[in-house]
């Protein structure tokens, strides 16, 4: 009898010990996250892309012949050299494969900074580029940059007639038939293509040595892997015709088109936050004004140029340029994590963040989205500090859910109106196929991805599984069900038909199938789909099956490759482990051994600051082209998962009662 009592006592003590360890881990992570809150209540973490944005920043300064900032250039040079891959070139993600365009830009920037072409790292880069056929294999965006520096001719890039700005909406190509990011990038680029300016480039730096042939002999790019041969040949023929007749267009027509592009740009100038609030259109806008003869003091050029410098992250030894900033996204996700963690410090901090978000809601401006939804009232949030023309559905859904949770769980008032307008806007932005896209509605002109300019395959913003899931989650958390709401019913049907055979869902904005599956399982759970539904069972089984031996989860960017649709193994990361845990718990699997092992992994890898170190990229800008490392993901997502685990284990229901 004594031995039985002793065993029971040991088991109880062990459980207490595990509970204390978990609670300590949550407390440390909470404290760590709170330390990043800004004085006005919001959070904003670094948002790092690959080497291309800092390289382009260096090249922009030399294009414009700006005074050389040797200290800043030295720091950017240190960054570029550090992220060079073992293969000699530069990757799109940490430890990733060689990428030609990234390598060409990084090499060019380092040479511009002053690195000798005989330096070992430059020799390795050049040899890696040569071994893969040379810089002729650069993508379209890189070729435009090379044309502007006079390294290749304008015959090496697609024709982008500025007269496109004058086409009616019913035409096959219209500026509002492509995504917001493509639209804002292309409008100033079309002006540049019309004027064909030459970089000032005071040092006269070139990179002819990266080519295996005379770069001025290079013609157009070949068909990209994602493109249909028939469509591509059609558009390639059209490009050839335009190349002949474009010089014959009336000058008055060209002037009117340029004026239309200028009006479009200046209406969306957006102060120091910049047009589109992302680097590429902002840089193109500055170069456009330069080509038009507007000096550095011209107000629209000057304000945009100041905005670009606000994207810099400058440390003691290194510096880089962010593609954009993510304060709304960081703030609402951190608030979710803190609400899950609870406590007398976490909840007030979350409220402070949510209060900061209230005036960030766009209630007046009808952005580009309204072209297809003119009768829908504005009500969304943008990703950045200010981006009135381009709110997004993902941010809006997540903000609404965090505010609703604060209202519901803590009786806080003042969010009702914001929630109602956000809900109204999201309901009005559902696409005809039942899904939701990030910024637009019914952006389904897939044939446009076959034009020569679209070698990146990211010209459109169609509905995706992850954004659809977030919108379904939000509507369901607000009380709608598939029985009471056509929006929810159509959204769930969209998710049901987009599940992959092995059980996963694609992740457009996070890497990749782990992210998509987390998003969808949260939505299905909130929408009332039974946990024994084969759709949920298959997804949960798949997640458990891909757990790494160390207890964590990881996935590589290679999973986005065109010839393979499925998860690609990778070392465990804190953020991807957190998504997998949150997904399994949404599926009712809090007691699954895989969940316990995942929690153990997070606790074991927590650092002395209570947070997690994560070098790998786990987010996506454009699949196969551009990836992101949110520095906040490894901070708030693991906290969220650990707190969710504790909360579910302390209840009898074991059911997640919120949309995320």
From Swiss-Prot:
* Gene it is expressed from: shc
Biological pathway:
Secondary metabolite biosynthesis; hopanoid biosynthesis
**Entry annotated with the keyword Signal:** no
**Keyword list, A-Z:** Cell membrane, Isomerase, Lyase, Membrane, Repeat
Enumerate the SUPFAM superfamilies for this protein: Terpenoid cyclases/Protein prenyltransferases
Q: How does it sit in the membrane?
A: Peripheral membrane protein
Give any single GO term for biological process.
triterpenoid biosynthetic process
User: What organism is recorded for this protein?
Assistant: Bradyrhizobium diazoefficiens (strain JCM 10833 / BCRC 13528 / IAM 13628 / NBRC 14792 / USDA 110)
Q: What is this protein called?
A: Squalene--hopene cyclase
């Amino acid at each position: 009898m004594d031995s039985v009592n002793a065993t029971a006592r040991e088991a109880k003590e062990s459980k207490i010990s595990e509970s204390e360890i978990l609670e300590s881990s949550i407390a440390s992570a909470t404290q760590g996250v709170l330390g990043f809150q800004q004085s006005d209540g919001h959070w904003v973490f670094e948002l790092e892309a690959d080497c291309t944005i800092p390289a382009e920043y260096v090249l922009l300064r030399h294009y414009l012949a700006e005074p050389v900032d040797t200290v800043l250039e030295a720091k950017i040079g240190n960054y570029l050299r550090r992220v060079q891959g073992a293969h000699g070139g530069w990757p799109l993600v940490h430890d990733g494969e060689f990428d030609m365009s990234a390598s060409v830009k990084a090499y060019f920037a380092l040479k511009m900074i002053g690195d000798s072409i005989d330096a070992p790292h430059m020799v390795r880069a050049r040899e890696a580029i040569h071994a893969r056929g040379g810089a002729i294999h650069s993508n379209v965006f890189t070729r435009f940059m090379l044309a502007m520096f006079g390294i290749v001719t304008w015959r090496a890039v697609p024709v982008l007639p500025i007269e496109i700005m004058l086409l009616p909406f019913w035409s096959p190509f219209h500026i509002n038939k492509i995504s917001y990011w493509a639209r804002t990038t292309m409008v100033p680029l079309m002006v540049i293509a019309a004027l064909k300016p030459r970089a000032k480039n005071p040092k006269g730096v070139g990179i002819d040595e990266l080519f295996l042939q005379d770069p001025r002999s290079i013609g157009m790019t070949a068909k990209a892997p994602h493109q249909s041969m028939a469509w591509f040949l059609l558009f390639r023929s059209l490009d050839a015709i335009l190349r002949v007749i474009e010089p014959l267009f009336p000058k008055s027509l060209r002037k009117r088109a340029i004026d239309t592009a200028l009006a479009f740009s200046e209406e969306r100038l957006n102060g120091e936050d910049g047009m589109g609030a992302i680097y590429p259109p902002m840089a193109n806008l500055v170069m456009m004004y330069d080509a038009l003869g507007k000096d550095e003091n011209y107000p629209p050029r000057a304000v945009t140029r100041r905005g670009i410098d606000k994207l810099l992250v400058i440390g003691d030894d290194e510096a880089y340029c962010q593609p954009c900033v993510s304060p709304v996204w960081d703030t609402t996700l951190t608030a979710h994590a803190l609400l899950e963690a609870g406590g007398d410090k976490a909840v007030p901090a979350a409220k402070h963040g949510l209060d900061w978000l209230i005036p960030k809601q766009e209630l007046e401006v009808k952005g580009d989205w309204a072209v297809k939804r003119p009768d829908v009232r504005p009500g969304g949030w943008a990703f950045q500090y200010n981006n009135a023309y381009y709110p997004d559905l993902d941010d809006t859904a997540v903000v609404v859910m965090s505010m609703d949770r604060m209202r519901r769980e803590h009786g806080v008032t003042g969010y009702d109106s914001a929630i109602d307008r956000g809900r109204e806007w999201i309901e009005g932005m559902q696409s005809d196929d039942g899904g939701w896209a990030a910024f637009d509605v019914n952006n389904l002109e897939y044939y446009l991805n076959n034009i020569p300019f679209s070698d990146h395959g990211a010209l459109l913003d169609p509905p995706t599984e992850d954004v659809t899931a977030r919108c379904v989650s939000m509507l369901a958390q607000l009380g709608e069900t598939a029985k009471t709401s056509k929006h929810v019913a159509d959204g769930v049907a969209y998710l049901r038909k987009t599940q992959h055979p092995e059980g996963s869902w694609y992740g457009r904005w996070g890497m990749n199938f782990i992210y998509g599956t987390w998003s969808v399982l949260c939505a299905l759970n909130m929408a009332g789909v039974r946990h024994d539904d084969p759709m949920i069972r298959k997804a949960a089984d798949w997640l458990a099956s891909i757990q790494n031996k160390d207890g964590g989860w990881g996935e590589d960017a290679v999973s986005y490759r065109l010839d393979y649709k499925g998860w690609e193994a990778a070392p465990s990361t804190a953020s991807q482990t957190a998504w997998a845990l949150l997904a399994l718990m949404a599926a009712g699997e809090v007691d699954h051994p895989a969940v316990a092992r995942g929690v153990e992994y997070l606790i074991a890898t927590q650092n002395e600051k209570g947070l997690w170190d994560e070098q790998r990229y786990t987010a996506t800008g454009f699949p196969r082209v551009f990836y992101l490392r949110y520095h906040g993901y490894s901070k708030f997502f693991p906290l969220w998962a650990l707190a969710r685990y504790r909360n579910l284990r302390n209840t009898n229901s074991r059911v997640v009662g919120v949309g995320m």
